[in-house]
Amino acid sequence: MHRPELKNFRRIVVKVGSSLLIDSEAGEVKAAWLAALAADIAELHLHGRDVLIVSSGSIALGRSRLKLARGPLKLEESQAAAAVGQIALARIWSEVLGDHGIGAGQILVTLQDTEERRRYLNARSTIGKLLEWRAVPVINENDTVATAEIRYGDNDRLAARVATMSSADLLILLSDIDGLYDAPPGANPDAKLIPVVEQVTAEIEAMAGGAESELSRGGMRTKIEAAKIATTAGTHMLIASGKIDHPLRAIANGGACTWFLTPANPVTARKRWIAGSLEPKGTLTIDAGAVTALRAGKSLLPAGVIRVDGHFARGDAVVVRGPDTDEIGRGLVAYDADDADRIKGHSSPDVMSILGITGRAEMIHRDDLVMGAVPG
């Protein structure tokens, strides 16, 4: 199958691992390599692309800054090292992107931020606003509070969740290997790179190997798990070597990599999930003008809501009905039931005075809204 071109994607998540970013001997960032990557990101940014970075390295940097001895760290030691390293990592990304006139915004997430709908919406809104302001979000797992029981444990899967959350259409995993091979390349000189994977099958998963072979496959098992998450959500993914300077430029120029393709797109996949997988917790009845606006692709504003029924929290799914009570669609609501009832019928600027907080302008954002009745 024909491999896509980087220039055809509008929102790209780039995952950078510790081994690429940090010199293991010196315990410091590989400055020249990072400068080259930042130049690649700036090039994409200049041409109107949204770029998000998922960056490892906080624990490794913290160890270096604290001059900790080599060897395994206890959980609380890792968390304390991450606290120091996160400050250093944020400053480094801010400086290298700032050299190109690009602002960077640090976002630290935990597993719950992508699993709980309320927190998911908060994180998604923050990312969306940074991108609207043409900043580059730099995202990492919050290692200072994550525990063994509630954490991603690897940034491949975190990057896939971030891509899903941000409705990215491409996820790039920069690795120490240039893609998926049909056999371990270190042990088999005849191993062949697989340029395109149209579907993650059992055969593809077998090529990635089990946990015991991760070192010889470049941690490929978690990358395949990331591919499953991303492609299910409508996001294409690719694995490419980050060991070279200007790795994104190399991809754009047709360099070696493995593409994982999906027939869906992020918005349709997300809306399919809203329509088919979530049990509605309440109902919003809207006026005729709001019905017309929604059918024209607009978001649902508080002013168009005439009745609120049910007990729902922010982030829950609700049914949207017209004045004749026919179902218009379903969506994820930005307010809980009590607040939605208080602001219904009011213009968005009134929300601050009614609730005492600066709330969302929309009751349901159009990206969180699926039009049409869902069969029972």
From Swiss-Prot:
Record-listed substrate binding positions: 56, 143, 155
Keywords: Amino-acid biosynthesis, ATP-binding, Cytoplasm, Kinase, Nucleotide-binding, Proline biosynthesis, Transferase
One GO term describing the cellular component: cytosol
Annotated InterPro entries: AceGlu_kinase-like_sf, Asp/Glu/Uridylate_kinase, G5K_ProB, Glu/AcGlu_kinase, Glu_5kinase, Glu_5kinase/COase_Synthase, Glutamate_5-kinase_CS, PUA
Binding site for ATP: 15, 175-176
Metabolic or biological pathway, per its Swiss-Prot or TrEMBL entry: Amino-acid biosynthesis; L-proline biosynthesis; L-glutamate 5-semialdehyde from L-glutamate: step 1/2
Reaction it catalyzes: L-glutamate + ATP = L-glutamyl 5-phosphate + ADP
Domain PUA, chain residue ranges per copy: 281-358
Keyword Signal: no
GO biological process: L-proline biosynthetic process
PANTHER family: GLUTAMATE 5-KINASE, ISOPENTENYL PHOSPHATE KINASE
Role this protein plays: Catalyzes the transfer of a phosphate group to glutamate to form L-glutamate 5-phosphate.
Family statement drawn from the similarity comment of this UniProt entry: Belongs to the glutamate 5-kinase family.
Name of the protein in its database record: Glutamate 5-kinase
Organism: Rhodopseudomonas palustris (strain BisB18)
